[in-house]
Amino acid sequence: MHRTGLIAAAGCLATLVFASAAEAQSMTTNEVKGTSISRKWRGTAGLVTTGPDGKVIFLFGETQPSVVCSPLQVCDIELQGGEIVRDVLVGDSVRWKVEPATSGATGGQAIHLIVKPSEPGLVTSMVVTTSRRTYHIQLKSHPSQYMARVGFEYPEDVSTKLADINSRLETGGIPGTAPDKLNFSYSVSGSAPWKPKRVYSDGAKTYVQFSKSISGQDAPVLFVVSGGQNRIVNYRMNNDMMIVDYAVDKAILVSGVGWRQQKITIRRGG
């Protein structure tokens, strides 16, 4: 009788375990929608460019950066100068080691996160909270390949710099150029409420025209893509017109961060 009771109890326990596992794996409609949004943001290709000294540069907030490290090597993730780190949380804190380091003079020091995996074939996530923002980073370990230096470009910094540049520039009208000298052969792809109405160039500058409702503050940030890198060039807003002091072949307009971020691509020649 006692043995029969134990068997029955074990059977009930197994049933509860399987039921709990099944319940954990099933998802509600909102849970499915939420994980789909998160997966889409994590899976976005995003912009990756080259910075000083071979640094890999991610555009902050566009997607979840994936940093590849290797055993017996270190990955250096450099944060913004003056940024104060609050917490560093790693999903797999046993097989991944993260240590802080600093560079620069007092008052403008940059925090570096030195990342080292214990073995190849690992994937985990890391959340870094700072005085300015929160980083969501994926960590991968590879047998031999790794990113020695990683950094970020911040859209809000670009806006601040351009506002300073624009304050020192005249916001005169478009110089008189004969219509037959203008090149309208630009394609504009992507979806955003502020998507440009048209783009054209006079050979020296590029003009990006938005709807009348846009203002200088609402305008997206522009990056010129050249040599595989995202570069900041001088531009200014004149009412609904963005005037770029550069003959653009390819550029990207970015507004917002994270899953709310919107991006438009401009290409000369379609």
UniProtKB/Swiss-Prot annotation:
Its subcellular locations are: Periplasm
**Superkingdom of origin:** Bacteria
- Where is the signal peptide, in residue numbers? 1-24
What the entry lists under Pfam families is as follows: CagX
- GO CC annotations on file: periplasmic space
Q: Main localisation, per the record?
A: periplasm
Q: Which family does it belong to?
A: Belongs to the TrbG/VirB9 family.
Q: Report what the protein is called.
A: Probable conjugal transfer protein TrbG
